[in-house]
Amino acid sequence: MLKTKQQIIALNRFRCWTSNLPGLQQQCRNQSTVTAASSEWEQAKPLSEMPTISPFQLLRHFLPGGKYTNLDTTQLMLAFRRDFGPIVYFKGSLGKPDVVMTNNPHDFEKALHNQGIWPMRPGMEYLSYHRQVHRKDIFQGVEGLLGSQGEAWGSFRSAVNPVLMQPKNVHLYFNKMSEVNKEFMERIRKIRDPQTLEVPDNFEEEINRWTLESVSVVALDKQLGLITKNRDDPTPKRLFKALTDFFEASGDLEFQPSIWKYIKTPTFKKAIRSLDEITDITKMYVDEAFERIEAENKNRNVEKPENEKSVLEKLVKIDKQIAMVMAMDMLMAGVDTTSSTFTGLLLCLAKNPEKQKKLREEIMQLLPQKDSEFNEAVFKNMPYLRACIKESLRVYPLTVGNARTQANDVVISGYRVPKGTLISMNSVTLIKDDAHYPRASEFLPERWLRASKENEKSAECPHALKASSPFVYLPFGFGSRSCIGRRIAEMELELGIARLIRNFHVEFNYPTDNAFKSLLISVPNIPLKFKFTDVDN
């Protein structure tokens, strides 16, 4: 294992070294860029002139009775923009770094192109503490992706990238995920009210079970039976509760002044307890998966062909400890995130029946029967479904934006921002603004489609609906630190929504105001009493 890690680190360093050996022509271009940047820096205003507030004044606003008390993260970002304008500087205190918070997509682009070879996305230091200190017996120096930084992050990412970012590896799971989705459809039929056809208030738990079952197909290479067979197993409920507790605590620890490094606060203790529970349960699942893989390999006369090996088998071949931590990260990061995205899309389709009808027409051409199977050709030919997912992520964003520590000095909105400063890029304040998304209050999947001769003169021509900048909202991140589970999450959503819309007409006959609350990510905030009416075959 040590040899493997040393090889990964050496490879990373070699890549960094070779990336600094450009040709003479590139050197000239770089020199020109440096000169332009130097001139821009000289003409920019000093950071001291940027709108700001003292750490003490900011802390007062978070105390009981303060104007930022009890705001969720989305509400907080909107309040900051209202109070300080498009950009504000917060001096670091209580363990927090200096932060420049901007609401300008041009700043987003500059900050994301200034993130360096190992992009720093600070945050979740309590997760690093949990893995490095509190449970170092389990993690043994392998931190994973969620809370690590620098070379440790780069080494781990380099190890798992070839497996998780390879489309053909993800496509191994068409049939297994299809079985999970069929089981979910039958569960909906069983739990809905026979008269109203509405599902119970706690349908969110059913969505979470479906999501965890789907993620487990990849992370653990098996179905856990959470939808029907093993419903009475208390372990999944413990995991769901721990994940919820973790996200609730994380929202406070990430976005509000915290003194947990000095005093172990109740919120910090809650986060650590939930991480203990998540770690113990996911390790149990992962250990079972390892035992199963070893038993299967012993019973084989010949080694399984490489193109038939699962993601977990390929990760184990790299390093067993890396495989275990990556499986944990997939389970931790892949349940609530996908559940919230799935819920947001269902709400959008339920409240926009004409868009749901258009989507169903696309799906029925590819899946003529309710139980028709997916294949790669079908999977590639669903542009409107993908557009619906992208638009729902705009309407119901999963996070408030992105953040990166700057690798070099940079000019942001005309101000000098020194390297090492954290730039917070607040997309959530822009995505409902007509200046950035025309007709921003409407659910318009068409804005994500390619223009055609038929629609180029219509009001729904994609060119007329595009964002003001591709950097306004990047739900899966940007560059080398973009979401490593994107392909898995997209396939899970596409297969799940396609199967559901092929089987049911979806309605939601209740208000959707404040449908989500914003913690570390957005999570449902209302009972999800969807009405599911069967669609004819």
UniProtKB/Swiss-Prot annotation:
Name of one Pfam family that matches: p450
Residues given in the record as heme binding sites: C483
InterPro entries in the cross-refs: CYP11_CYP27_families, Cyt_P450, Cyt_P450_CS, Cyt_P450_E_grp-I, Cyt_P450_sf
Cofactor: heme
UniProt entry keywords in alphabetical sequence: Heme, Iron, Metal-binding, Monooxygenase, Oxidoreductase
EC number(s) from the headed UniProt entry: 1.14.-.-
GO MF annotation list: heme binding; iron ion binding; monooxygenase activity; oxidoreductase activity, acting on paired donors, with incorporation or reduction of molecular oxygen
Protein's UniProt name: Cytochrome P450 CYP12A2
Organism of provenance: Musca domestica (House fly)
Taxonomic placement: Eukaryota, Metazoa, Ecdysozoa, Arthropoda, Hexapoda
Gene that encodes it: CYP12A2
